[in-house]
């Protein structure tokens, strides 16, 4: 969490400041892993401080590092993005996070090395793009789950 504001109506707004080369495109805005971060901030802020969850808003404040040099129009150095963070999204993100914790760690807090962790390639194998195991025998290309 980078910034937390409270307005005169008792609404809390949580901002997360990100830097990006030229801002976020539509694919980055749809990236559930990226947007889940602020949804979890909202959940944990509500739990920790006892603030009603419906009185918490979230927003990404994206600072562009580069602008198009030969643009024929004015450019903004800052982009704001409000991800979905309603009750359905909150429930889905919380369930996914709890499932991750349950599968990744044992009851004593140690890492679960015995679990099964299927390779989910995702749409157009997007999840594999930067994966260090994509060319490894540990992740057989034929066994990856497409979605």
PLM regions and their residue ranges:
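Non-catalytic protein-protein interaction segments used by genome-maintenance enzymes to assemble
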Residues: 1-39, 46
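Metal-dependent nuclease catalytic regions and adjoining charged, substrate-binding loops involved
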Residues: 31, 43-147
């Amino acid at each position: 969490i980078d910034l937390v504001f409270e307005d005169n109506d008792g609404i809390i707004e949580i901002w997360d400041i990100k830097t990006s080369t030229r801002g976020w495109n539509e694919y980055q805005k749809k990236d559930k892993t990226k947007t889940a971060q602020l949804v979890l901030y909202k959940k944990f802020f509500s739990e920790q401080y006892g603030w009603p969850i419906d009185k918490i808003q979230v927003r990404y404040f994206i600072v562009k590092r580069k602008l198009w040099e030969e643009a024929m129009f004015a450019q903004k150095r800052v982009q704001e993005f409000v991800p979905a963070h309603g009750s359905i999204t909150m429930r889905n993100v919380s369930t996914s996070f709890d499932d991750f914790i349950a599968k990744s760690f044992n009851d004593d807090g140690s890492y679960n090395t015995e679990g099964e962790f299927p390779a989910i390639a995702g749409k157009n194998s997007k999840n594999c793009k930067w994966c260090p195991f994509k060319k490894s025998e540990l992740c057989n290309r034929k066994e990856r789950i497409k979605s």
